[in-house]
Amino acid sequence: MLIAAWAQSPAVGAEPAAGRVLQAAGIAINVDLPDSEFTGGPQPLLAWIKRSADIVAHYYGRFPTRELRVTVIPTGGSGVHGGTTFGRYGGYIRVRVGRETADAQLVEDWVLVHEMIHLALPDVGENHSWLSEGISTYVEGIARAQMGNRTIEDVWSEQMRSMPKGLPQAGDRGLDNTHTWGRTYWGGALFCLQADIEIRRRTHGRYGLEDALRAVNRESGGIVVDWPIERVFKVGDAAVGVAVLEDLYAKAKDAPLSPDLDALWRELGIESQAEGMRFHDDAPLAGERKAIMKGS
């Protein structure tokens, strides 16, 4: 979940006290962590924060912000129970973690990677939250797979199951005007998938979506600044040399854009079978499929 850089709310509270400094992904992360609240102690949680930062830094070519504060809030039970990202303090994440969370649950967690990805994009405003949430939803699995934290099969399986949630329903008025959960998260992710494929196709594999996102992050500095969404797409397209983002946005912002997902999976060479995922390397977009998970 992303909260605008300027937002004030009771949930934010007073400025957090940084309990320790963790060196990770080339930056110093100030971590507020009540050690005694967690049965496993602080080390698994610190390793989780470092691992998540390394995953995001690998995808973006560097960590998205120059500094970061993370507050770990203890909750009942086990598992990671959600997080919120702010543009304050140069980048600030509050994440809720169960007191009895096991190491294995932290290794498999997606929440903190999702939140750290939010740091990379300028604040584009609430009407365009589909872009920030869509990027985080789409990039999380790919970035983790590139670092061996998740299998490629699992990522494509989730996309096949969940991308239909992002398709427009009756009464849809485009991504900028339809603020349902499905359109915000998976509609945004579907936009990213389409853009990623098209960038790779039109540049003959030279560039991918990550190159556009890296350029946006480098020029803006990420969540700490406000940008109009049009500037995001202009900078991203300039970096890859093709106007994919601007063209796709023009089609999807004010009207329902509903790609044929079954046809898309066939072109990518992805098939879900009872025994697991099967990949067809003779499919028309098999090269683009492999490149997405390999990265640049």
Model-derived segments and their meaning:
Residues 1-5:
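Bacterial N-terminal signal peptides
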Residues 12, 222-296:
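Beta/coil-rich, acidic/histidine-enriched accessory regions frequently appended to metallopeptidases
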Residues 18-124, 128:
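Juxtacatalytic substrate-recognition/specificity segment
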